[in-house]
Amino acid sequence: MTKIHACSGWCALVLMAGMNVAHGKPLAMVGPWEIHSVDPASNGVFFTRMQVAETLVEVDSQGNLQPGLASQWSSSGDGLQWRFTLRPGARFHDGSEVSAEQVAFALQQAWRKPGVMTSAPIASIEAHEGALLVTLTGPFAPLAAVLAHPSTQILAKGAYDAKGEVTQVIGSGPYRITRLQQPQRVETERFDGWQGPQPAISQVSYLTVGRAESRTLMAESGQADIAWGLDPVSIRRLQQAPRVSIVSVTLPRTIQLKLNGADPLLKDPAVRRALSLAIDRRGMAAALLRDPEMAATQLFPPTLGEWHQPGLTPLAYDVKAAQAALAAAGWLLGADGVLHKGEERFALTLRTFPDRPELPLLATALQAQWKAVGVDLKVAVGNSSEIPAGHQDGSLQLGLYARNYALVPDPLVTLLGDLAPAGADWGVMNWQSPAMEQTLARLGKETLPAGEAAALRRDIATTLQQELPLLPIAWYRQSAAVSRELKGFELDPQERSYRLDKLTWSAQ
C-alpha cells in the first residue's frame, strides 16, 4: 500500500483537551440560509460548518487535505483499493463509538443517493479489521478529496430510520445539537466527549433571518454576535458601527449564469458569446458589490490557483460587438425594442433567489443591460430549489447563483459532476463536449506529470471560455459582521467551518 497521508499533531490536541476552558455567554449567529433538511445529501454543509458533524478527511485554509475522522489513509499500487484508519476513541454525540462498521454504513447511504460520491468509480465500501476499505472499479486519484465533501459526513446509527434516511443529526464534532426548529433555528452546546481542546464558548445558536436589513440591525444592536450574508450597503453601514467589525475573505466561488443549451434562443455559441459581451461585469461589481476587482473575467477565480488561467483572453464588455453578433445570428431589432427572428421574440426568464442578497440585484442589472441589446429578460426571484427543479424538468432557461468550486477540496471532483454530459443541477444544462469529457476523465484516473495536468486544465478553461455554457458574472468575497467582544474569529476560505471552537469572549 502506498501511504498518502497520516495524522499529525492530534495527540497534542488531545493532551490540551479540557485545559483553559472558559465559560461565557451563548454565541448568537444570524444568516439568510434556511435549514431545509437534515439529510447530508442536501444540507450537509450547514452541519459541518456548525461543527456538529465530521467527515473522514478535513481541509486546511489552503485547501490541503488533513486528517478528520480518519487519522490516515493509503491506496494500493494499482489505485483500486483505499484504506482509511479511524481516529482512535472517537465517539458520537449519543455516546456510541465511531466504528468502522458505522462509518461504512453512513457512506453507503451517501453513495446510494445522487451526489458527489457517484463521481468516483466505487465498487464497494466495507469495514475490515477496524478500518474502512473502499474498492474502486478503476483508479480515481481524488477519492480522499471526495470523502471531505460535507455530504459524506459520518453520523451515528441513531441518526437513521429503518429505510436508511436521516431523521436527526448525531455527529461527532465539538458541538452537539440541543434544539432544532426547521427551517429557522438550531441550538448547540459543547460536546464533552470531544477529543480535542474543549471550545471556550459552550452554547451557540443560529437563526435564519431573511432580510439583510434585519440582520444588519441585529448586529448593530448586539442581538447577533455574528451576522452572515451581508449585502454591500449593509457592509458600508456596519463599517461605521461601534459594536462590530467586518471580516472578509475571497472565496473559490463564482456567481454564474446557467444557460439551457437546448433552448432555441441559447443553443448557438455565438449568441451566448453575444450575451456575454452585453454584460458590464466591472460596472456591476463596482456599483452593486462595491468591489470592482470581483468582476469575473473567466469562470475560475484567482483563488483556484491551478485552475485560474491568467493567459485566457478575458471576457469583455462591448455592446456594439454584441449587437453585431446578434444581427449576424439573424436577430433583428423590432419596433417594440426587442430582437426578433421571424415570429420569434428574444424573450427569456431568469430564475434566482434571495439567500445571497446580491443575486436579485445582479439579476436586475442584467435585465437592464440586456434590454440595451434587445433582449426581453424577465427576472423571477423565488426559492433556491427552483433552479435544480427547472433543470430536472427542462423548464429552466437561465439560473443565476453562486457556485463554490471547493466544497470538494479538489475542484476536479465538482467539475466532473457540473460538466458531465447529462448536466447537473448547479452545472451545465443540455451542453456537452466529448473532448472535455475525455480530458476530465484523464485528470481523474491518472496521476499525471504536473506540466501535463496543467495543460489539460488549461484546455478545459479555454473550452468553457469559448463555448460559455455557463456565463461567469462575478467572483466572490464573503463578509461577516462580528461583535468586537469576540476574539479569534477567522473566516474559512474553503467555507467548510465557522471555526466556533476557536472563539473566546474578550472578557475571558
Residue ranges and their predicted role:
Residues 71-114, 133, 265-267:
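Aromatic- and charge-enriched surface segment that lines or borders ligand/interaction sites
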Residues 190, 267-368:
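Append "and occasionally in soluble cytosolic enzymes with long acidic Gly/Pro-rich linkers
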Residues 85, 116-158:
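Surface-exposed binding/hinge segments that line
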